[in-house]
Amino acid sequence: MARARSLREFQTSFAAETSCAAFLFERRWPQGFVCPACGAGRAALLRSRAHTYECLDCGRQTSVTAGTVMHRSKLPLTVWFWASHLMATHSNGMSAVQLEAQLGITYKTAWLLAQKLRRSMIDPHREPLEGVVEVDQAEIPFRADNSFFDPVRSGKILIAGAVEVIDRGTNQAKPKRKRAKYLDTRSGRIRLAAIADNSAASIEAFVRANVKTGTTLLTGGHRSYPGLTDYRHDPRTVGKMAGHIVLPWIHRVFALMKRWGLGTYHGLRRKHIDTYLNEFVFRYNRRFYRHVSISQ
């Protein structure tokens, strides 16, 4: 991956549909075309269908956008590429209003484009968290559509979060001592997800989906965690202490998440909370590489 350039430089590199299609072809078939049906290496570019190749052996037609959020979209590839660049490199994200202004498209198109890109930010085959992981739950505010001035239609939604705790000196997993300062540690990767409630079933499902078996879990001592017998459980009783003192890193993540949602989108919508969480996880996990864009 190459360091991101300015939008103008990026647009120069991907100024035409052909350059975007050539990039996608190279990423899909770095060693040359291979038919997904028969494995043959001979194909012809169709004139009747954009960016589509037909296998000369079996006749299977395959587009360079197949399996991506761009497939069967009526938008030019250049718009997809420019929008991806903006959303990947902008420090706080891009709202639909900003994409509308930057790309010269309608608000509806910008909104749909942003939603599809957010859904694609999470790799379904990503590696689970491991080592030492802080886990906790928090409530974040949301608002329904067009309810900015209507508190009746606003509320809070429960989310679960997990964050790796890393030693600053060795970059290895390090369990933080109770009541110890966290200046000698840093946060690693995170995971966030909306959950229905604080029940053992909801919390265990979140942990098993996002944290590797055998990992040390630092928690607030909630009664739902002891059922995770195949994890090392290190409960930190909160008692009268604030949660951010006992579990500093996950509560720092929660605080940043709330501030980001309010600052960038002026509040999160309940209906699309999963896509917003995906985007925040994406940005947090690549916070040291936020100027990295599409490979050149």
Where are these regions (language model features)?
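Residue-level recognition of single "structural anchor" positions
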Residues: M1-Q296
